[in-house]
Swiss-Prot record:
Keyword annotations from UniProtKB, A to Z: Ribonucleoprotein, Ribosomal protein
Designated name of the protein: Large ribosomal subunit protein bL33
PANTHER family: 54S RIBOSOMAL PROTEIN L39, MITOCHONDRIAL, LARGE RIBOSOMAL SUBUNIT PROTEIN BL33M
Lineage: Bacteria, Pseudomonadati, Pseudomonadota, Betaproteobacteria, Neisseriales
Designated gene of the protein: rpmG
Keyword Ribonucleoprotein: yes
Chain positions covered by the region annotation Disordered: 1-23
Organism for this UniProt entry: Chromobacterium violaceum (strain ATCC 12472 / DSM 30191 / JCM 1249 / CCUG 213 / NBRC 12614 / NCIMB 9131 / NCTC 9757 / MK)
Amino acid sequence: MRDKIKLESSAGTGHFYTTTKNKRTMPEKMEIKKFDPVARKHVLYKETKLK
């Protein structure tokens, strides 16, 4: 089953992306570099709980 997750910027801008992931094939927390439009550069986004 794919669960909804929130990827939050580590730059401290408060920007986030929402996506889904398969917890069975990827049980660890996701970390991915994506573009932060507030900081206007690519930064590390870390998985947090989607409320």
